[in-house]
């Protein structure tokens, strides 16, 4: 299975564009790492820089590595939007409920 996972507000805190200040959410990272360990392809997908044009790739890669977030790919091409409607989405709050 190929699983796309958002970063901000999903595996770390939301920082309103101050991405260097993001704090990891370890229990959420562990849950995604389990999916990785089970053989799923994990792609972290973020809209960092989509409005400003700033390239956050290196900082984001460093954060994922420091946080121990296992993944196969990092994609920074997620568009900025206010609402996402899709037949395959899962709300992160529902997904990470214990």
Please name every model-derived segment.
Residues 1-98:
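Catalytic phosphate/metal-binding cores of nucleic-acid and nucleotide-processing enzymes, i.e., regions
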């Amino acid at each position: 299975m190929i699983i796309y996972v958002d970063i901000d507000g999903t595996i770390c805190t939301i920082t309103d564009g101050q991405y260097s200040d993001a704090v990891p959410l370890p229990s959420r990272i562990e849950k995604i790492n389990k999916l990785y360990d089970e053989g799923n392809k994990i792609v972290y997908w973020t809209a960092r820089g989509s409005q400003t044009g700033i390239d956050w790739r290196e900082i984001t890669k460093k954060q994922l590595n420091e946080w121990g977030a296992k993944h196969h790919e990092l994609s920074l091409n997620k568009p900025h939007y206010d609402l996402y409607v899709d037949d395959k989405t899962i709300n992160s709050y529902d997904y990470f409920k214990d």
